[in-house]
């Protein structure tokens, strides 16, 4: 039986992971759970899955969590704050850690898990986008395995099983195109928050749904793929694939192309991240290609998706620039979700913050954390200035 710790148990990845734990009780048991602030749902999960250790990110919510668990015997160890998240990530009873925390907040707990020798089912792309220069050397030092959970990287990981080293020519990441794939670029200045949250294929969290609409999600995945699979950026391409059935493809040295297909449902890549190197039988409906009829692909329109080019540029520049781009994007998307800025202000803000940054070529963890905070502050400062001067 696999003992797992789940970081970000109340989010989209976390709740779907627990669905799978409940479906396969003979295969998985929960050792630790964490949430940033959803104390009510976290308490419900603790009552159901009986972990040994639980963390709440916001320390002031710890008394409420303790109150919601009154009468539980045995009571799990309750911890809080970033230190508490890291304690859960490194707990000695866990064999595999699922990182479902959204954003750069997942970096420190993931590092704690790696240093504790845990294999990582990685659903937090920002860990590698921002922290790749620090994370990958630690992965090699501690001999742990990174098993990608993002559907695209899981697809590539699956396609690479059994492929001889040195045979990979390029990666083709697929993207749905998000909420505005059928909108002309000229109409994007009319986008509302409600429009941007209508993803055509996937059910996801709010932040990643906006990232899908801007294609920044795919840009971050390009950077993540660079770190996971060791390819230069000119060997990582993006295709718009409206049906979201082909989750990604690889091209090999002999021009053979391998692809992984499946319904647009995160349960499958999460399950593979939990069970690898095994595959578990599922009760789900099989893919029906006859019913689907056709699968289509096209190149992304860079006028419509400037964030994709910003991500490629940041990845190629390297150093601290990907961390700056990621932090600025998190801050800008948060402002858009609060309806404090417009949709097209997101790429404008990102470009301005990146232009202001002096890149540190070989950053330490401290450098990454410092530029992360700096980029968020810059977004807030720019957004507070007159839109006509700053965002036009």
Swiss-Prot record:
Its EC number is 1.1.1.267. Its cofactor is Mg(2+); Mn(2+). This is 1-deoxy-D-xylulose 5-phosphate reductoisomerase. 1-deoxy-D-xylulose 5-phosphate binds at residues 125, 151-152, 176, 199, 212, 217-218, 221. Mn(2+) binds at residues 150, 152, 221. The keyword Manganese applies. The gene is dxr. It catalyses: 2-C-methyl-D-erythritol 4-phosphate + NADP(+) = 1-deoxy-D-xylulose 5-phosphate + NADPH + H(+). Pathway: Isoprenoid biosynthesis; isopentenyl diphosphate biosynthesis via DXP pathway; isopentenyl diphosphate from 1-deoxy-D-xylulose 5-phosphate: step 1/6. NADPH binds at residues 10-13, 38, 124, 126, 205. One of its GO terms (biological process) is isopentenyl diphosphate biosynthetic process, methylerythritol 4-phosphate pathway involved in terpenoid biosynthetic process.
